[in-house]
C-alpha cells in the first residue's frame, strides 16, 4: 500500500525495474498541459504550467489585459476592433 499522499490522482505511477531484477512502482507528479489562447488555440508565451505553487501570481502569467488567457496578437486585434467601433 502506498503512502497516503501518493494515493492522489495528481501522482502517476511509473513501473520501474531495479538492478536486482525486482520491479517496483515509483510515483511522479503529473505534468500540466501548455496554456493555449482562447481564440486561436496557439500555446501562450510567458505562462508557467508546472509547480505553480512555487511562483507568485505575477510570475505565473503576463500582467497585461487578458494575460494568460489570450495571446498578444488576438489581444491586439481585439483592441483594434473595439477602438474602431465594430464588433
From Swiss-Prot:
Pfam families: Ribosomal_L34e
Example of a GO biological process term: translation
An example molecular function term from Gene Ontology annotations: structural constituent of ribosome
Domain of life: Archaea
InterPro entries assigned: Ribosomal_eL34 (IPR008195), Ribosomal_eL34_C_sf (IPR038562), Ribosomal_eL34_CS (IPR018065), Ribosomal_L34e_arc-type (IPR047868)
GO CC terms in record: ribonucleoprotein complex; ribosome
Keywords associated with the record: Ribonucleoprotein, Ribosomal protein
HAMAP family, A to Z: Ribosomal_eL34
Family listed: Belongs to the eukaryotic ribosomal protein eL34 family.
Protein name: Large ribosomal subunit protein eL34
Source organism of this protein record: Sulfurisphaera tokodaii (strain DSM 16993 / JCM 10545 / NBRC 100140 / 7)
Upper classification of the organism: Archaea, Thermoproteota, Thermoprotei, Sulfolobales, Sulfolobaceae
Amino acid at each position: 500500500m502506498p503512502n497516503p499522499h501518493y494515493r492522489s490522482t495528481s501522482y502517476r505511477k511509473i513501473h520501474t525495474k531495479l538492478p536486482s531484477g525486482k520491479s517496483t512502482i515509483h510515483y511522479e507528479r503529473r505534468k500540466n498541459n501548455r496554456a493555449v489562447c482562447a481564440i486561436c488555440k496557439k500555446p501562450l508565451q510567458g505562462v508557467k504550467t508546472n509547480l505553480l505553487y512555487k511562483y507568485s501570481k505575477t510570475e505565473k502569467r503576463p500582467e497585461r489585459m487578458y494575460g494568460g488567457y489570450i495571446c498578444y496578437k488576438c489581444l491586439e486585434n481585439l483592441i483594434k476592433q473595439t477602438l474602431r467601433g465594430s464588433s
